[in-house]
């Protein structure tokens, strides 16, 4: 006779199931479990007197015969493709299966075999997401990497050489010498890394040299001169070598206006950084470029979301980042031309309707590397409060909105940069870069980060305590952050050409190097849940933004969630 259990008790024991709802941190965002792949009455759970014991939930199957290395039990997966409850099996550092774990000798419909070689991570009552991807990194200091990892980022793409003046302003690792040194430096960090070369050169040989040296993309930045001719040269090489081009356009409109940049791009695929313009770009109307099908538009997090402090903090940030002088009126005018409340307010809404597709940091160069995920969901909260449920959602849940926003920091940046075969979502066959969250800390502080199948970061108490939980509890690096485990758990992304030229061996790289691919045959329609192509017009006098004839405007927030109640120091 079946034993009946009430929903509350079930959720407390095994985590929420289909039809249950979960609040995300202290936001007004609520998700509802769409499907449960575990089997009622046959759930697996570890612990004294629990299921995963020899002859019960643990089978006699050897690892060589199919038992997984790790199982995350009863997790609530939040990904672009769904919000479901499932067990997740990991083997050889990869996602082996998503479904029902257990012992096939005594349980039906087992997808993930637990054996004596299987470790268990308890996912009950936790949310599981893919490790996030930040594609706008200024590699100014190595300490950024630990900060990013602690926030749930597992892949960082960008450029730089350290705290050089050029790196402080631009995400470029210029030339083969610097690219080689940064690739060698990447060996030390428990993070997937990739580096952009400098794309600003009309001599295409300079660009080829950098791609052949290992650059996984090229970056055009106005501080190096983003003219129509450099745009054309850079895209020519990108098309030839299958790497992505990222662009920070000409704020001062010296070499042309946004229409000239669009003409120079000529329908070729390109990733536009801080597409609203406060981070840089044709003033005041770079934002209209998000209506182009070949443009993959992203934001950086200093303008996410629009609050009462957003405008005030930007001027000083901008002056420092771009090596401007407050004693020179023209420098001040340059900075002020980029900061417009009207376009920042419109940016919130363009994200909410899926017209802006990616959010990244702009680390230490106006953006905060540890706040990408937090600010993404602060924006989602703001739009829920100000605009109500999306058409695809209901009064019961915000599932579509949450999936739209999680896509901006996971699968979409992966697609944009040709690494989505490997990372960016929780799917069978991808690298097991996974983040486990308590719902009350979702998008703020991960409970645990898995990197390449091993635990790389976790909330951890006093190391001298008798159990793991006594305070002070804070995020700390775990074993996969050290030694050869680090080397095996993290990866470096390079151009295919550089791998073909044996660059990893020439540089004595030990991390597995993976080629980026399929960056040139994509467009905005390939980006998940964020592919809208609005017709954008910007009033040159008032800076008001219109999308398909509708004025896009919203008020700044006075108070955001996921903020001071989580960060006391």
From Swiss-Prot:
The active site is at 322 (proton donor). It comes from Prochlorococcus marinus (strain MIT 9215). The keyword Cytoplasm applies. NCBIfam families: PRK13206.1, PRK13207.1, urease_alph. It is an enzyme of class 3 (hydrolase). This is Urease subunit alpha. Belongs to the metallo-dependent hydrolases superfamily. Urease alpha subunit family. Its EC number is 3.5.1.5.
């Amino acid at each position: 006779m079946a034993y009946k259990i009430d929903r509350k008790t079930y959720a407390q024991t095994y985590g929420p199931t289909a039809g249950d709802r979960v609040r995300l941190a202290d936001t007004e965002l609520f998700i509802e479990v769409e499907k449960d792949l575990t089997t009622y009455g046959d759930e697996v759970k570890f612990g004294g007197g629990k299921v995963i014991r020899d002859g019960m939930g643990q089978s006699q199957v050897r690892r060589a015969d199919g038992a997984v290395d790790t199982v995350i039990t009863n997790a609530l997966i939040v990904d672009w493709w769904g919000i479901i409850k499932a067990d997740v099996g990991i083997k050889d550092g990869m996602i082996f299966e998503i479904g029902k774990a257990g012992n096939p000798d005594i349980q039906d419909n087992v997808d993930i075999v637990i054996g004596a070689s299987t470790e268990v991570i308890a996912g009950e009552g936790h949310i599981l997401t893919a490790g996030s991807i930040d594609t706008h990194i200024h590699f100014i200091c190595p300490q950024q990497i630990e900060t990013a990892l602690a926030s749930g980022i597992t892949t960082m793409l960008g450029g730089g050489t350290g705290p050089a003046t050029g790196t402080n302003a631009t995400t470029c690792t210029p030339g083969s010498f610097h690219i080689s040194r940064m690739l060698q430096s990447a060996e030390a960090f428990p993070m997937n890394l990739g580096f952009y070369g400098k794309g600003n050169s009309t001599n295409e040989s300079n660009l080829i040299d950098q791609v052949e040296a290992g650059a996984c993309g090229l970056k055009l930045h106005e501080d190096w001169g983003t003219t129509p001719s450099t745009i054309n040269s850079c895209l020519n090489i990108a098309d030839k070598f299958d790497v992505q081009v990222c662009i920070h356009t000409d704020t001062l409109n010296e070499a042309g206006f946004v229409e000239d940049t669009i003409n120079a791009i000529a329908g070729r695929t390109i990733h536009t950084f801080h597409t609203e313009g406060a981070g840089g770009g044709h003033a005041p109307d770079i934002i209209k470029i998000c209506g182009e099908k070949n443009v993959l538009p992203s934001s950086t997090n200093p303008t996410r979301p629009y609050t009462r402090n957003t405008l005030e903090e930007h001027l000083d940030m901008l002056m420092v980042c771009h090596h401007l002088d407050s004693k020179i009126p023209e420098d001040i005018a340059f900075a002020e031309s980029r900061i417009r409340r009207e376009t920042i307010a419109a940016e919130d809404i363009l994200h909410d309707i899926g017209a802006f597709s990616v959010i990244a940091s702009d680390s230490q160069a106006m953006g905060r590397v540890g706040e990408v995920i937090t600010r993404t969901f602060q924006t989602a909260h703001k739009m829920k409060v100000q605009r109500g449920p999306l058409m695809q959602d209901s009064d019961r849940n915000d599932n579509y909105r949450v999936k739209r926003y999680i896509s901006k920091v996971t699968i979409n940046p992966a697609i944009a940069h040709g690494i989505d075969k490997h990372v960016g979502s929780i799917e069978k066959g991808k690298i097991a870069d996974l983040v486990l969250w308590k719902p009350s800390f979702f998008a703020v502080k991960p409970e645990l980060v898995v990197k390449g199948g091993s635990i790389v970061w976790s909330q951890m108490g006093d190391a001298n305590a008798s159990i793991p939980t006594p305070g002070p509890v804070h995020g700390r690096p775990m074993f996969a952050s050290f030694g050869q485990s680090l080397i095996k758990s993290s990866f470096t992304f390079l151009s295919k050409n550089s791998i073909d030229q044996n660059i990893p061996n020439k540089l004595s790289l030990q991390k597995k190097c993976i080629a980026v691919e399929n960056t040139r045959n994509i467009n905005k329609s390939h980006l998940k849940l964020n592919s809208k192509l609005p017709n954008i017009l910007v009033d040159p006098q008032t800076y008001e933004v219109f999308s398909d004839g509708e004025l896009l405007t919203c008020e700044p927030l006075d108070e955001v969630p996921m903020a001071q109640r989580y960060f006391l120091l």
